[in-house]
A protein has these predicted regions:
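Alpha/beta-hydrolase superfamily serine-hydrolase fold, recognizing
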Residues: 1-333
């Protein structure tokens, strides 16, 4: 996968370096001493303010880093006039397998706040931002969209069920973020995500060896909030970080327009589960466009080629990215 990804990076149809400047591994926060970085692609085209696309990678919250969607970032930066931010967040296995699920989501919230404060330095328009991600990254993006108004800057998640961002601008409080809608974005694209951690944990899947990502990550399965909490006795905690339980009715709060995709042959996040989430959004009156990518498997947006699944970025991802960017152009330009 890695070698093919690098080869695709030499293809100017995927990666035309004349069309962007790259700020690589920009450190934007260091929660508990763990450096978090993002790659920022800025258009070389004349202009001072371009829409911003924030990207979060997949990997079951246990695997991968931003490199896995590097071809995607390169393709968008090469072919569209967007500032692209490819963001890393802590995985559950990081910091000696101690990261909690709310901390992971807090990294994503912090990234949005950092980008809004600083993206003007990279030719980005902080008032025209979209979030996107695939698989786990779609889940994270959905949490930003649904729960960006549920934050705290102190106290324990188990007490207040609010997310603490890993980065908050100086002199800004949780109330400021909420009252000024600082985590609001203007559009979202969610690709083959899962949106119900509570259900998976309740069934004894996510936090056990039944979840193969623990084994692949060479990590011991555990509770995602630590060993003192579980889905049976602490359902409110698990529901608080499950997007499907946090969709507001449009009369309460209008969400940004969303483009949600599935893959017809996906066995990791099957079509029926994604359609359930789309239905929940529609039932709440929220704006959503849904597309099922026929004859495709999970992770078709990954860089390079995935030999086990047969995915090929050049063949499979680019048609999907054209649809995604058509949607974003219709909402942000």
């Amino acid at each position: 996968m890695y070698l093919i990804s690098k080869l695709y990076s030499l293809d100017k149809n995927i990666n035309n370096k004349k069309n962007y400047s790259l700020s690589k591994n920009v450190i934007w926060a260091s929660p508990k001493g763990f450096d978090l970085a993002m790659d920022i692609y800025s258009p070389t085209k004349e202009g001072s303010s371009f829409p911003v696309l924030i990207m979060f990678h997949g990997g079951g919250f246990l695997l991968r880093r931003k490199y896995i969607i590097e071809n995607m970032a390169q393709y968008i930066a090469s072919n569209y006039d967007y500032v692209v931010c490819n963001v890393d967040y802590r995985l559950l296995r990081d910091q000696k397998n101690s990261v909690t699920f709310d901390e992971l989501i807090g990294d994503a919230f912090g990234a949005v706040l950092w980008i809004k404060e600083n993206i003007f330095n990279y030719k980005g328009n902080e008032g025209s931002i979209a979030v996107t991600g695939d698989s786990a990254g779609a889940y994270i993006s959905a949490m930003i969209v649904n729960s960006g108004n549920k934050i705290a800057t102190s106290g324990s998640f188990s007490d207040h069920l609010c997310i603490t961002p890993s980065y908050v601008p100086e002199s800004i409080t949780a109330e400021d973020v909420k009252n000024q809608n600082l985590l609001d974005v203007q559009a979202a694209v969610l690709s083959y995500g899962a949106y119900n951690l509570y259900s998976s944990a309740l069934k004894g899947i996510f936090e056990t060896r039944k979840n193969p990502f623990w084994t692949l990550a060479l990590s011991k399965p555990r509770g995602v909030f630590g060993n003192n909490f579980n889905a049976q006795e602490n359902s409110e905690m698990y529901k608080a970080v499950s997007p499907i339980y946090n969709i507001p009715n449009i009369d309460e709060r209008k969400l940004p327009p969303q483009f949600i995709t599935s893959a017809s042959e996906d066995r990791v996040t099957p079509v029926h589960a994604i359609e359930e989430y789309v239905k929940a959004l529609k039932d709440a009156g929220q704006e959503v466009t849904y597309w099922e990518y026929k004859d495709q498997r999970h992770a078709y947006l990954d860089s390079g080629k995935t030999f086990l699944s047969g995915n090929d970025f050049k063949r499979d991802a680019i048609p999907a990215l054209k649809k995604i960017m058509n949607f974003l152009n219709s909402k942000l330009l």
